[in-house]
């Protein structure tokens, strides 16, 4: 994988249904089986922000430094960004108004361990949004403006009891013991029927739209066979080197020289520059703060 040198890492994102590490002004496609070798800079700077319907990113006016382990934006730029308004409903009044009047999808997303969450996304970003979250599958259940979609999401959360947030550890847990696609689809459709009976809405579809997303992540066999070491923070001057074995949502999965599978959140890379590989580095993946997500090697009903 060819990585531009002396360019800032902006984000790990999904473009045309494929994961890319956006560096400088171009995207580098992350392909399973390819090697990755980057050295992060000694300093980390805010990546700026993108407003709703804007085509270009606005640089941070303060060129603010960002500590490792945090999001790649300073507080000012974070609150200017369309994603902040989309998540919270707050922010610039005009941007909030534009977002709330735009079409949104209401969806159910399925994760490992039969965890199902409810969420909303801009209609034109609906498939990208569930890929960013690392959902195994999703069911689009309704369409309406931002206000109507959020109201339905809130009712489903409070009246049906679905979560609106899933921990990364849960998303990476038991990936080798997932049930069949049919089982997942039936589980989502069962929740959809329950929602219609408890809290019907005029923006809900008569027939929901199911998408099976697992193949998009191109998970290598190592992910199913090994414990996953979740990187808790990426400090300055870290060398990230290994073979890509998948991208789960916004998390890069790598096998390093020690044969372990490491999960590196894209948000920890955002803001660093990729410096020359000959540069001195202080840290490697094996020396970072890690949390083990054990592989479930027990047989399940679906193995019989």
Q: Where do the PLM segments sit?
A:
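Non-catalytic accessory segments flanking enzymatic or RNA/DNA-binding domains
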Residues: 1-304
């Amino acid at each position: 994988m060819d990585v531009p040198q002396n360019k800032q890492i902006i984000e790990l994102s999904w473009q045309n249904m494929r994961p890319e590490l956006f560096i400088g002004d171009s995207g580098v496609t992350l392909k399973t089986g390819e090697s990755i070798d980057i050295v992060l800079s000694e300093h980390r700077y805010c990546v700026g922000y993108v407003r709703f319907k804007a085509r270009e990113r606005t640089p941070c006016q303060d060129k603010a430094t960002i500590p490792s382990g945090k999001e790649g934006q300073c507080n000012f730029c974070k609150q200017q960004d369309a994603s902040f308004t989309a998540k919270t409903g707050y922010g610039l009044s005009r941007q909030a108004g534009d977002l709330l009047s735009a079409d949104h999808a209401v969806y159910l997303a399925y994760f490992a361990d039969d965890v199902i969450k409810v969420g909303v996304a801009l209609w034109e970003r609906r498939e990208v949004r569930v890929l960013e979250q690392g959902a195994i599958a999703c069911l689009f259940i309704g369409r309406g403006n931002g206000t109507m979609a959020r109201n339905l999401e809130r009712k489903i959360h409070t009246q049906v009891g679905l979560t609106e947030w899933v921990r990364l550890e849960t998303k990476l847990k038991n990936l080798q013991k997932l049930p069949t696609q049919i089982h997942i689809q039936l589980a989502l459709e069962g929740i959809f029927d329950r929602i219609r009976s408890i809290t019907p809405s005029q923006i809900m579809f008569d027939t929901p739209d199911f998408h099976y997303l697992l193949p998009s992540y191109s998970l290598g066999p190592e992910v199913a066979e090994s414990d996953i070491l979740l990187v808790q923070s990426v400090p300055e001057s870290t060398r990230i080197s290994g073979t890509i074995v998948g991208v789960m949502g916004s998390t890069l999965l790598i096998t390093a020289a020690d044969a372990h599978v490491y999960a590196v959140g894209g948000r920890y890379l955002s803001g660093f520059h990729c410096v020359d590989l000959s540069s001195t580095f202080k840290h490697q993946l094996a020396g970072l703060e890690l949390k083990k997500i054990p592989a479930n090697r027990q047989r399940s009903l679906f193995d019989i």
